[in-house]
Regions:
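Phosphate/Mg2+-binding loops and adjacent switch elements
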Residues: 1-31
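Catalytic core of IPPT-family isopentenyl/dimethylallyl transferases
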Residues: 24-157
Length: 157
């Protein structure tokens, strides 16, 4: 959110317009997509831990600061997950615990939608981190990158 606002302030261009322009450019890179996933219960636990950490690191103060500087809750940028959930709290319409619970729920729902989108739209190597460790994921990745021609092998070894 802050990055998008800074970009608009510096360039006068919407961040979404910039992203659309970049998306149209042909990449000079030979790339492959590696997608990490895990069992839903483990993913949801990590989401909850991450949100708890974000709260400890000042998420509430960040949102309050934006609102205090006059950023309207109606702005698209303020409708993002992690911001919109706290507006009712600052308006006195819910408790902080209720706002955090709503943030966790919305984040879990978003993660589920992301996984669905990736499964339908993106071709690549899926690695289930619930079934392997870091070394196993690395081995799978290296094999895949070689198969895709992204990683060249030295035939002398």
């Amino acid at each position: 959110m802050t990055r998008a606002l800074e970009y608009h302030y510096l360039t006068g261009q919407r961040f979404s317009e910039h992203n659309a322009e970049q998306k149209e450019r042909e990449t000079p890179y030979n790339a492959a997509v590696i997608l990490l996933t895990m069992e839903r219960e483990a993913l949801y636990a990590r989401i909850e831990q991450r949100i708890d950490l974000m709260m400890q690191q000042g998420l509430l103060a960040e949102v309050k600061g934006l609102l205090d500087r006059g950023y309207s809750p109606k702005l698209v940028s303020m409708q993002g997950i992690g911001y919109k959930e706290f507006v009712p709290y600052f308006n006195g319409d819910c408790t902080l615990d209720e706002a955090v619970t709503q943030l966790k729920t919305n984040t879990r729902r978003f993660a589920k939608r992301q996984l669905t989108w990736f499964r339908r739209q993106i071709e690549g190597l899926w690695i289930d981190m619930s079934r392997t460790d870091g070394a196993g994921a690395l081995a799978q990745t290296m094999t895949y990158l070689k198969e895709q021609g992204v990683l060249q092998t030295n035939n002398n070894s």
